[in-house]
């Protein structure tokens, strides 16, 4: 499975592509950041993020896009920008018929480090180790995007089995 991880942000939108299957060594195919100037008009920033993500989709042809689920932050302005960048990533994938998976920051941290309360340095160190890299990807947004892709590759098989079981249960006329 090839997954594009997206760590949404208006100024720095981390992107990373990981390929592999659960239980096997994973391979990083690409990592980077789509940047926009903080002083640019919002609409232009969103268009720049769209163009950047479209380039990644064209180049790497992922089977799925994993996006960090936006959660409540103390700074409303920050959460709005994150949500807007997240929506752009989801729109780009949906337009192409690529499935989108949302993962919370604590889900990603737990999947990659074993602790949902891990800090950025711990996530970066584990991404480096899991992907057999020489150094942690910089900035942290890039490492977070790879962590999202890793999380999805590892969690997708269990999520798919659960969805199939629920569908089978529903098809037999049972309710939850």
From Swiss-Prot:
Transmembrane segments: none
Swiss-Prot/TrEMBL keywords: Cytoplasm, DNA damage, DNA recombination, DNA repair, DNA-binding, Endonuclease, Hydrolase, Magnesium, Metal-binding, Nuclease
Localisation per UniProt entry: Cytoplasm
Cellular component per GO, a single term: cytoplasm
Keyword Manganese in annotation: no
Cofactor(s) needed: Mg(2+)
Statement: the UniProt record of this protein carries the keyword Magnesium: yes
Function: The RuvA-RuvB-RuvC complex processes Holliday junction (HJ) DNA during genetic recombination and DNA repair. Endonuclease that resolves HJ intermediates. Cleaves cruciform DNA by making single-stranded nicks across the HJ at symmetrical positions within the homologous arms, yielding a 5'-phosphate and a 3'-hydroxyl group; requires a central core of homology in the junction. The consensus cleavage sequence is 5'-(A/T)TT(C/G)-3'. Cleavage occurs on the 3'-side of the TT dinucleotide at the point of strand exchange.
Entry protein name: Crossover junction endodeoxyribonuclease RuvC
Organism: Streptomyces avermitilis (strain ATCC 31267 / DSM 46492 / JCM 5070 / NBRC 14893 / NCIMB 12804 / NRRL 8165 / MA-4680)
């Amino acid at each position: 499975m090839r997954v594009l991880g997206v760590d949404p942000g208006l100024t720095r939108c981390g992107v990373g592509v990981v390929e592999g299957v659960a239980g096997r060594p994973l391979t990083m195919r690409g990592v980077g950041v789509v940047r926009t100037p903080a002083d640019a008009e919002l609409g232009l920033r969103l268009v720049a993020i769209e163009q950047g993500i479209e380039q990644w989709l064209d180049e790497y042809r992922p089977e799925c896009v994993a996006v960090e689920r936006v959660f409540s932050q103390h700074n409303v302005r920050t959460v709005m920008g994150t949500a807007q960048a997240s929506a752009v990533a989801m729109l780009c994938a949906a337009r192409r018929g690529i499935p989108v998976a949302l993962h919370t920051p604590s889900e990603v941290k737990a999947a990659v480090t074993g602790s949902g309360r891990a800090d950025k340095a711990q996530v970066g160190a584990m991404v480096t180790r899991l992907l057999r890299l020489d150094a942690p990807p910089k900035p942290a947004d890039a490492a977070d995007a790879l962590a999202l892709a890793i999380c999805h590759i590892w969690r997708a098989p269990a999520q798919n089995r659960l969805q199939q079981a629920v569908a089978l249960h529903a098809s037999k006329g049972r309710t939850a």
